[in-house]
């Protein structure tokens, strides 16, 4: 039987609310449209409803195989053994609860909690997932062996010039330096609003309308050098030196990050506390999910608890390469604009 409750005299069914949350994707539409997040059934099946750490297989590329043999009727066609690798993944579990004093409703006739349940929970979780994704990207880029995936144009002294800002060729040059001839696979550009404004002024950032197979509709999205632009001021600037802000702009490739949700017990529920403050209604939410950058392993033994914090995701010491760095489709430009 569904666990139920009351919010502002509104009958709450946790199962129905869960279905509603699943229908209202908690992943940003821009992230979905870019295709950087790839649902991975292997990850989903490996973690399933139990466990939070798993080793999942990576199938090695054959790009560097020797040339095909000459079929001359004499040469033996000796098979090359296919090899695979594994990368370690770890689910991140998050929870958040809200409460409302019923006295507030008594005075105003309005229910903030009801409004939150109907309108704000989905945007909240979209923002949280986006922050975890950016933290993961930051950690990966600082890992040993990923040095060529970062270009630093910034300065923290003297004066800021155009050379310290992103220009027409900046993303092209970084893409080539990071992954060589695979640079055309970059599909998402995450940047601060100051960087986006700079690109707009140069007419390098423009709105493009097209049909998105992922979203199933026509969309108009900002794009720069063929990449969809996600503009966010969170996690994209180091303002330690106010006169020389350093902006981090991230490039992510299509299908670069495997993802899957992990089953959690009672993801949504309500409770009425008769005792506290003359009565309080509470809404509880939980989510668990995996962001697994292909080609990288998280060092699960370095994670203190059973779920990595955002700071632990950001820490490069908690990540290591599981393949050639060129198969990690993540890169970063540091600039002053």
What annotation goes with each model-predicted range?
Residues 1-26, 245, 251, 259-266, ...:
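Protruding loop/beta-arch "assembly-hinge" segments enriched in small, turn-prone residues
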Residues 192-196, 202-204, 211-282:
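Extended serine/threonine-enriched, polar tracts that run as long, contiguous segments within proteins
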Residues 104-178, 312-314, 319-328, 332-337:
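Alpha-helical scaffold segments that mediate packing/assembly in large oligomeric complexes
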Residues 35-43, 173-175, 266-269:
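Short alpha-helical segments and helix-capping/turn motifs at coil-helix boundaries
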Residues 143-221:
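Extended, solvent-exposed, turn-rich assembly/linker loops in the middle of proteins
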Residues 64-67, 108, 198-201, 207-208, ...:
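Short helix/loop capping segments that flank catalytic or ligand/cofactor-binding pockets
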Residues 1-89, 258, 317-337:
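N-terminal "assembly arms/tails" that initiate or stabilize quaternary assembly
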Residues 56, 83-149, 181-190, 194-195, ...:
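Long, contiguous amphipathic alpha-helices that act as assembly "spine/axial" helices in icosahedral shell
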């Amino acid at each position: 039987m569904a666990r139920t409750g009351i919010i502002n005299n509104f009958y709450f069914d946790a199962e129905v609310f869960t279905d509603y949350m699943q229908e209202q994707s908690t992943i940003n539409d821009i992230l979905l449209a870019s295709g950087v997040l790839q649902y991975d059934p292997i990850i989903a099946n490996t973690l399933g409803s139990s466990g939070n750490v798993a080793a999942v297989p990576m199938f090695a590329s054959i790009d560097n195989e020797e040339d095909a043999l000459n079929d001359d009727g004499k040469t033996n066609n000796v098979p090359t053994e296919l090899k695979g690798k594994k990368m370690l993944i770890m689910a991140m579990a998050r929870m958040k609860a809200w409460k409302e004093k019923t006295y507030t409703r008594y005075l105003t006739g309005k229910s903030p909690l009801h409004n939150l349940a109907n309108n704000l929970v989905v945007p909240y979780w979209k923002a949280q997932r986006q922050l975890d994704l950016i933290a993961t990207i930051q950690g990966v880029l600082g890992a040993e062996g990923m040095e060529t995936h970062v270009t630093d144009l910034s300065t923290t002294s003297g004066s800021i010039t155009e050379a310290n800002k992103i220009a027409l060729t900046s993303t092209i040059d970084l893409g080539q330096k990071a992954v060589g001839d695979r640079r055309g696979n970059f599909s998402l550009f995450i940047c601060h609003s100051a960087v986006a404004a700079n690109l707009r002024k140069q007419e390098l950032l423009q709105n493009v309308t097209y049909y998105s197979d992922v979203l199933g509709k026509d969309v108009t999205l900002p794009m720069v050098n063929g990449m969809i632009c996600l503009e966010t001021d969170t996690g994209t600037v180091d303002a330690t030196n106010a006169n020389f802000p350093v902006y981090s702009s991230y490039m992510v490739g299509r299908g670069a990050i495997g993802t899957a949700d992990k089953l959690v017990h009672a993801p949504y529920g309500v409770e009425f506390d008769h005792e506290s403050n003359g009565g309080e209604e509470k809404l509880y939410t939980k989510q668990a999910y995996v962001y697994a950058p292909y080609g990288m392993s998280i060092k699960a033994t370095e994670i203190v608890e059973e779920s990595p914090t955002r700071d632990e995701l950001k820490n490069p010491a908690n990540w290591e390469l599981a393949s050639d760095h060129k198969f990690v489709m993540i890169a970063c430009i540091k600039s002053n604009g």
